Amino acid sequence: MSKKALLMILDGWGLGDHGKDDVIFNTATPYWDYLMETYPHSQLQASGENVGLPDGQMGNSEVGHLNIGAGRVVYQDLVKINLSCRDNSILKNPEIVSAFSYAKENGKNVHFMGLTSDGGVHSSLDHLFKLCDIAKEYNIENTFVHCFMDGRDTDPKSGKGFIEQLEAHCAKSAGKVASIIGRYYAMDRDKRWERVKEAYDLLVNGIGKKATDMVQAMQESYDEGVTDEFIKPIVNAGVDGTIKEGDVVIFFNYRNDRAKELTVVLTQQDMPEAGMHTIPGLQYYCMTPYDASFKGVHILFDKENVVNTLGEYLAANGKKQLHIAETEKYAHVTFFFNGGRETPYDNEDRILVPSPKVATYDLKPEMSAYEVKDKLVAAINENKYDFIVVNYANGDMVGHTGIYEAIEKAVVAVDACVKDTIEAAKAQGYEAIIIADHGNADHALNEDGTPNTAHSLNPVPCVYVTENKEAKVADGRLADVAPTILHILDMVQPAEMTGCNLIK
């Protein structure tokens, strides 16, 4: 008899501290209690670097399902770059090697430009400092930093401090602050080319207020009532840091939307009517892919294509699969679970159950869970699927309302649906793995007793429903779920999946 597996994702169903805030623990869940007493279970980490997010950041449904389906940790750009700086693998990055080797061999200037703040939305000071260190290592004669000031993701007068930090770092590393301008000009995203031209003229033609002390120049701008975001162009009078033919430019913003327009006028398209022309022979490096249509630019950290996800691998091996959820979590069990792919694979069926039309889900805490369960049980009884993934949305969607009584009702509904689903699956010879993508209903109150509507940092359960009395399940993270499913199906794990089978 061929093996079959059911993966049940209870959205927002974390393992709480059993205090008053832990609605799941404090609500009567007879079937969940039976599962915990009867079957092997463990804990999975579902937040921070365990799911490819910055350390200490709570997990979310998109990232959770991506990691679950991928069978590996899928790192966000910021985390990928952070890790590369931390373990020094950035030094072996072929584009980094090409940029600095070219500058060294041809005696060219190196320019770093980007948002100079610790806001963490578009860029990171740590990345800029690391680039300065690499320039020092390559012994580059002229390294210039062009600072775009923030004031949106940071306090409006914090920029002066960032320039002080940068100058202190450059003093022991490499680089000089060549120019300063507000992000209002350098990082427009609405085709206001007259703003972009202010930045272009500063970078290429050295047009701006001349200053010998860049920190003092920032203070003077504040004194005139002009804060970081709107700082008018400032030029360091002590250096010629303009961008010239054949120079190396590294734009260190990792978010693409506000890095595109300046890149366009420097590298992609002449705008004679606005007095802007691309610069010949520029060796231009973007931190991440800014736009698929850009030609002739280098990319330091390219987008990862997540290949051989669980869905793709099952399809390639001729297995039949079903993905089912209500509207609120349908994209999660399809698009995100399949690594960012919209189209179903061969032999992949999908069932979408409409979520209830209510203003907020505390008005209908059971949501469409019973309808999902009925359709799912019917599909299980057809006995044609090798693999089924289902998401019950209530713990998360009702958890976000912060209304305790509603969350209790949501938990009761999920418990009832889990029972009917698992009993049907057992009767048809399925083994099941029950997990969550992140916590929420397990932490419904803040310490002061006010409602907490956010996700939790708690680990999530992993229950293995099996007839095998000897089985044990190890602790792990969400990336270990797909390899565990493949183990149940007696399939070899593909090389791209770096997670571990948790069944011992």
UniProtKB/Swiss-Prot annotation:
Chain residues that bind substrate: H122, R152, D153, R183, R189, R255, N256, D257, R258, K329
GO molecular function, one term: phosphoglycerate mutase activity
Annotated keywords: Glycolysis, Isomerase, Manganese, Metal-binding
UniProt name for this protein: 2,3-bisphosphoglycerate-independent phosphoglycerate mutase
Keyword match Nucleotide-binding: no
Enzyme class: isomerase
Catalytic activity: (2R)-2-phosphoglycerate = (2R)-3-phosphoglycerate
Main function: Catalyzes the interconversion of 2-phosphoglycerate and 3-phosphoglycerate.
Cofactor: Mn(2+)
Pfam families: iPGM_N, Metalloenzyme
InterPro entries: Alkaline_phosphatase_core_sf, BPG-indep_PGM_N, Metalloenzyme, PGAM_B_sf, Pgm_bpd_ind
Binding of Mn(2+) 1, residues: D396, H400, H455
Active site annotation, chain numbering: S61
Gene3D superfamilies associated with the record: Alkaline Phosphatase, subunit A, BPG-independent phosphoglycerate mutase, domain B
Quaternary organization: Monomer.
Segments traversing the membrane: none
EC code(s) of this entry: 5.4.2.12
Source organism, top-level taxon: Bacteria
Family the entry assigns: Belongs to the BPG-independent phosphoglycerate mutase family.
This protein's GO CC annotations: cytosol
Binding site for Mn(2+) 2: D11, S61, D437, H438
